[in-house]
Amino acid sequence: HGGKLDALVNNAANMYRQPVDGYTEEHLREAFETNVISAMMLSSVAVPHLEKTEGSIIFIGSTHTRRAFPGASPYATTKAALEGLTKVMAAELGPRKIRVGCILPGAVITELNLRAGLFSEDEIESRYSAVAGLHALGRVGTAEEVAESIAHLVQSEWITGVALEVDGGIGLGASSF
């Protein structure tokens, strides 16, 4: 009791791989409840507290919204919803001095990748090595690097409504021919 809230980081995620004709309504509902509805509800509850501190709301999206990854339809759709929500909330909450941003991580070493069944624990090193060359910086990212970008948005008093790609340059295309 009595504490203050400077920032809310909406980082809940549910991800699994299924072809378009393989997911169920239950999969879709679970993805939307975890990735979108929880973020909207938490943000709504946080607004009065963030207004007192002129704080920030940060959503964790994904570069899945910028590039097509087969099997990721529900995940990409929910993360795109967070990008749209970022713009709307930034416009709505700006006059109340609350900034809203979205971070779009690329390939990052996280527990979610294992839980999503993207690859087994035995395959993790070889899979990350395989995609490292697709990045302009020649490697995948770390959770700490994503956290640094979150801190940047939280601390920047003149940035709102943006979706920042934190992807080591994978969006630039292959780094060699």
Feature locations, PLM:
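Active-site loop-to-helix junction immediately N-terminal to the catalytic Tyr of the SDR YXXXK motif
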Residues: 23, 68-76, 88, 116, ...
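Active-site loop immediately N-terminal to the catalytic Tyr-X3-Lys motif
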Residues: 20-21, 67-73, 95, 138
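Active-site helix of classical SDR
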Residues: 43, 78, 86
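Substrate-binding pocket helix/loop in short-chain dehydrogenase/reductase
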Residues: 19-20, 27-32, 131
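C-terminal substrate-recognition "lid" of short-chain dehydrogenase/reductases
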Residues: 40, 49, 139-166, 171
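Alpha-helical segment proximal to the catalytic Tyr-Lys
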Residues: 48, 91-95
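Residue(s) in the substrate-gating loop at a strand-loop-helix junction
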Residues: 62
